[in-house]
Amino acid sequence: MRWRHSGSFLRMTEGGSRMRKACRFWALIMVVALLASPAFGVEAGTMTPEKETAVKWLDTHAAVGAETATYIWHNPELGLGEHKSSAVLQEMLKAAGFKVESGTAGMKTAFVASWGEGKPVIGIHAEYDALPGLSQAAGVAEEKILVEGCPGHGCGHNLFGTYSSMAAIAIKKAMEEHGIKGTVKLYGTPSEETLVGKAFFVKEGIYKDADAVLSWHPGTENSVSYASSLAMDNFKVRFHGKASHAASAPWAGRSALDAVELMNIGMNYMREHVRPESRIMYCIPDGGKAPNVVPPYSEVWYFIRAPQYKMVKEIVDWSKKVAEGAALMTQTRMEFVPITAVWQYLPNQVLAKVGFANALLIGIPPFTDEDEKIAEPFSRSLKEEKGPFLSREFKEFDYDKPFSWATGGGSIDEANTSWVVPMVRFSTSTLAKGTPGHSWQSVAQNILPPAFKAGITVSKYMAATALDLFADPKLLEDAKAELKASNEKHGPFVDPVKDVSLPTFQLMHNVEESQVPVQTKGDMPLPDFSTLK
C-alpha cells in the first residue's frame, strides 16, 4: 500500500473501496481536529463585520495596489532620494481622504498620513527605498540588467510601501462604515536600507502619540514574527594626510590610505576577541585617486552588528581607539563620522498573538497553479528543485515562550520604534522559495502577480489586526504593559542617534543624488486613484 500527501489530506493510490472510505473518514476527522485546535498556541481570530468591510474593500481595489507597486518598481530610488515613490504614496492616501504632512523629521521624502481623531492611534509603517546597483528586468529568471548602475527593488519595498498604504485605507473604510473612533496613521519612512528613517523618527518623537505600530516585510515565508534582530552601528572613519609625489618625495607625504589599511588590520585582529555572534563589516569608499600620489584623504565604512546594542557599543568604542592608533602610526588626522545606529528588535507577545490570530483567520495567499509556474524558474535558478515553489504554510513561532535575542541575520531601523511603542511585524511569501533578499531574482519577482497577491493578503492581516486593537482597549493596555516590563528587564532604551545629525544622501551612498542612473526617463503616468474616494 502506498500513501501520498496532498494538501491536508492523505490519499490512497491502491486498495479496496472500504479502505478508501475509511481513509476519507479518518482524514476528515484529522482535518476537523486541526481546524478546531489552536495553531502554535494561538486560535484563529473572528471575522467581524468591520473586518469583512476591510477585506472586501481590499479585494475590490486589488488592481490599484498592483498598479502602484508597479509604478514604484519602475522608478527605483535610493534612500532619502525617493521623490517619486514617496509622492505616489502620498497621492494615493490623499485621494482616499487622509491628511498628509511631508518632510517629517527633516527628511524630504518622509511623511505621515492621518485619518480620524482621538485615541487610540494605530500606526502602520511604509518603506519605499531601493538598493544600489540592482537593476534587473521584470519576470526574467536570469540576470539581465536594465540600466547599468541603476538601483532596483531587491528588498520588495515597492510592495512594502504600497500594501501598507492599502491596509491603512482599508482600515479607514471600515472605521467610517462602522463608526469606529480613533486615528489611523501611515508612517512613510525613507531610507530603511541604511537604517535611517525610523531611527530619526524615534529621535524626533514622531511616535509619541501612537498606541501601537504594525509593519511587515516581503519574503519567502508567511509569518507573524516573534523574533529579534541584530543591533547595529553604521559609521565612517576619515583619515586626513598629506599629498606628495609617491616616487620622488614619498617622505614628504602622509598616507591616509595607510591609516585605513592599518585600522582594518587592527579590526581584523579584534575579531578573535569579540563575541562570535558579532559581525564586523567594512568597505573602502575612497582609497585615493592615483598610485603616484600619496593619498591625502581616505575613508573606510563600517557596520558593526551584535545581538544587543550594548555589545555593539563596546566594539564601536574599541574601534575608535583602533582608528586613533592608526592615525598615530601614520601621522594623519582621524575623523569619526557616525551615520546611524539601531537597537535589537523588541518583540511584543500580546500583539504577535493578535496578529497571528488574524493571519490564521485570513489564511495564506491564495496562490494558483499559474502562480506556481511563475515562481518555479526562479526557485530552480537557485537550486530549489522541489515544489511547491511558493510557501503554503505559516512559519512556526512559540508565542507562549519568552523570545530570544537574534544570533544572526540582519538589522532593521524599526527596532528602535519597537522600544518606544508596541509593534508587530508580518511577512508573506511574495517570493519563490530559496530567493535571497537583495538579489536580482528578488528584483525580477517583486513586480509579478504572486507578489501582488501576497501583498493584498498582508494588507488584510494588518487591517484585521488594527480593527481588533480599535475594538478592544484591553489589548493595547496589555501590549503597553508588556513594553514597559521589557524596557525594565532589557533596557532601558537609550536612543543611539540622539547626538547624531541626519546623514546626507552623499554620506550614505558615496555619490551625489544627481549622479544616480535613472531607470524610467521622464514622468510615468500615475495610477488612477479616483476609485479610492
Language model features by range: what are they?
Residues G45-H153, N158-T183:
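Acidic/His- and Gly-rich active-site-bordering loop/insert found
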Residues K144-G152, N158-L159, M175-P295, R305, ...:
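Histidine/acidic-residue-rich, glycine-tolerant segments that coordinate divalent metal ions
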Residues R18, S37-G41:
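Sec/Tat signal peptide C-region and signal peptidase I cleavage site
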Residues M1-R18:
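Short, Lys/Arg-enriched N-terminal segments with co-localized hydrophobic residues
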Residues A27-P38:
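Bacterial N-terminal signal peptides
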